[in-house]
Structure formats: structure tokens, C-alpha cells
């Protein structure tokens, strides 16, 4: 039994030694992609979040400048990383929850790598279709909730 435990422990340690660097490389690639959405002074100090399949957000890196960035969404046809300020995150969370955005708060989102934006007619579209006017845009910034 002791020999089995030693073998299992050694196997788990070996797997960790192989998997951990691969995960770190994947996170580094996501961080680099996310940072590409904004000027270096913004992206370099931003908190980096990666959306997970269950709808939660994984923090890849804590930031220091009040901005956040997210890497490309693989569910969209193009590369679309983005970075924004705190007010834009409140707007985005309201949009994802299908709720009204916060009143009286203007946010800024950078998409300097361009974007593959959802529909111009359906803000909850998840794929291009014949009737939803899916658009691909170049480098841009978005002012959120400026009403």
C-alpha cells in the first residue's frame, strides 16, 4: 500500500511538472492578447480577466491602474480583445445580465486590435446570420452609456 501511495504521488508530481508550464504559457498568451487592445500604459497595468465556459471570470493577473482587459472571445469570428475602465465594466456586466446600465456613469473601452462585433440589430447575437448585420471593425474606442 505504501508503495502504491509513493507511485501515485510521484505520478501526480510528474503530471504537475508537465501541465503547470503549459497552463502558464496559455495564460501568458491570453494576457498578451488582452493587452493588445489598449495603449501599453493601460494594458500593461490592467487587471486581466478571462471569461470561462460557465460564465465566470478567471483573473489571470491583478492590475494596478484601475483598468481591466479581456482576451479574444473564441466564440466570435475575429480577434476582439478589449480593455476598459471601471465604469465600462459596470456597463458590460449589466449588458451580460440583460439589465439596464448604471445611470450617470460614462465608461471607455479600447479595442485597438479591432473587433468582430455582434449584430448591429441584436446585442445578444452569438453568431453571424443572414439577418443580424454582424460587423467586423478596425481599431476603435467605445464610449459607453453616454446618455
Model regions and ranges:
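Primary mode marks residue(s) on the alpha4-beta5-alpha5 output face of response regulator receiver
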Residues: 25-147
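Bacterial N-terminal signal peptides that target proteins for export
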Residues: 1-9
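Sec/Tat signal peptide C-region and signal peptidase I cleavage site
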Residues: 18-24
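Bacterial N-terminal signal peptides
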Residues: 9-17
